Amino acid sequence: MIELDRLDLGGGRRLVITSEPDAAVPQVRDADGHWRRAGPGDGVAEAMLDALNQNPGTTKHGNFTLLSWASQTARGERPITVDQTNESVIVGDAAVVKWATHLQEGPHPAPARIKALRGNGFRGMPMPWGLVTWQTADHPETLVVTVDEYLPDAVDGWTWAVALVTDAAQDRAAVPALVDAVTAVGCVVAELHAAQADTARPATAADARSWREAALETVETAATLGTSVSGELLRARREDVEAVVGTLGDLAGIPVLAGHGDLHVGQVLRAGGRYVVTDFDGNPVLPAEARVKPVPAALDVAGMAQSLAHVAIVACKYTELAPAALADVDRLARTTFVGAYTDRLETLGHRSVYDPAPLRALRLQQVLREIIYAARHLPRWMYVPDAALPALLDEGTST
């Protein structure tokens, strides 16, 4: 581990930027004067909250920038023990401090998006307390610390959505609960896009060309890596698939905006009767320069709609469900989500930012990315694209 930089938080606590691995590492100085990696209970997360509270607005500290909305601090640290990419500490049951233990290559999309969403009054996310970024002449700005409100008993969509779909497929009396949930999520996504409407612009011919090229490259990669049912089907129907995703090259002029960029049910938490969107880091499979670019609103809509289809696949993996009932619930969830989204967007006066034309192509591209992800990182997930690809290719609707 090589130390590149440090942010002094006072009281023998600091944040260190390292390479090999690239990480933001909280450290505490012991009584003997030696520095070590800090854990929950060592007070570094508390010190981070104090620093944000003492530096409102945007302040520079060497190569670090603090962006703070915090009007309070908190005491008492405990870990979040579920599996996650980064390391998070709950402070005083009020805030969550997330250390970026795997630094993304900059420029990072989250700081600008979160700042804009908060400034435009978007409330469909955990309330941000502050951010810390790091930038040098050799390293574009990247996110090293995120601090958000703590949401007790928050559950992500791979839990709440699977449970709701399972219940609805087993008992029609449970359908209204599913409809209410996906309606709420559709409204939140619409509110997100409305809050970013001032970033909208027409896509250029170069944008459309890059989307087509990236999609065809995804087809090639998925066809090469896929060795299961979905890979075989993709190779057999490659011409059909390329024809669908190739239409992304015809989208010059479509509105693009600073959307979420990696939206799926796993990014939507249910907490205290509300649904909130998390993780504005952009799609991790894309290079840094692509993650910060504006996207069609349909990308977020397609990501959520297709993930709802995947929820149904997961549901029947773990519970025996009548195929016809599950198919009805799957279709209802997706159409309800898209309908709620478009209705809410229109009510907010920003229907013009959404063009549904690329919805099918973007859903298909997402399934191909699932093949690649499963092949490279999580083979046990392959059952999802194995079921999703034939269903989508044979589907007669765009939702």
Swiss-Prot record:
This is Glucosamine kinase. D-glucosamine binds at residues 262, 370. Belongs to the actinobacterial glucosamine kinase family. Mg(2+) 2 binds at residues 279, 281. Monomer. Catalyzes the ATP-dependent phosphorylation of D-glucosamine (GlcN) to D-glucosamine 6-phosphate. May be involved in the phosphorylation of acquired extracellular GlcN derived from the hydrolysis of chitosan, i.e., in the incorporation of exogenous GlcN into the bacterial GlcNAc metabolism. Is unable to phosphorylate maltose. Its cofactor is Mg(2+). It comes from the Bacteria. It catalyses: D-glucosamine + ATP = D-glucosamine 6-phosphate + ADP + H(+). GO terms for biological process: carbohydrate metabolic process. Mg(2+) 1 binds at residues 267, 279. Its EC number is 2.7.1.8. GO terms for molecular function: ATP binding; glucosamine kinase activity; magnesium ion binding. Keywords: ATP-binding, Carbohydrate metabolism, Kinase, Magnesium, Metal-binding, Nucleotide-binding, Transferase. Binds 2 Mg(2+) ions per subunit. ATP binds at residues 98, 149-151, 156. It comes from Mycolicibacterium smegmatis (strain ATCC 700084 / mc(2)155). A motif (Substrate specificity determinant motif) lies at residues 366-381.
